[in-house]
Amino acid sequence: MSYKGDIKSVRVTATGAVFAGRTRLRGIILASDGGGAGTIILQDNTDSTTLFQADVPTGDVFSVNFPEDGILFKGGMKVSTITNIDAATLLIDN
């Protein structure tokens, strides 16, 4: 699979804004911290609409690349929930 434009990786370990402007989620890698099943919720930064939610089993790694245009975050992207995840690497449009 190839992407139509430049992407960048952003590593997050806590809740908060990831990117202020319009962007697309192209892929994600989650690493459990071993303390239980992990959860991450990504929302639009302006209207708090949940656009992606994933769980990762205890002690495991979850990875996915989204086909074609990925998931559009029109108002930017924020992490609203991140529990039992050591780190998340988000692949987004540059």
Predicted regions and their residues:
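Surface-exposed, low-hydrophobicity beta-strand/loop segments enriched in small/polar/acidic residues
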Residues: 1-94
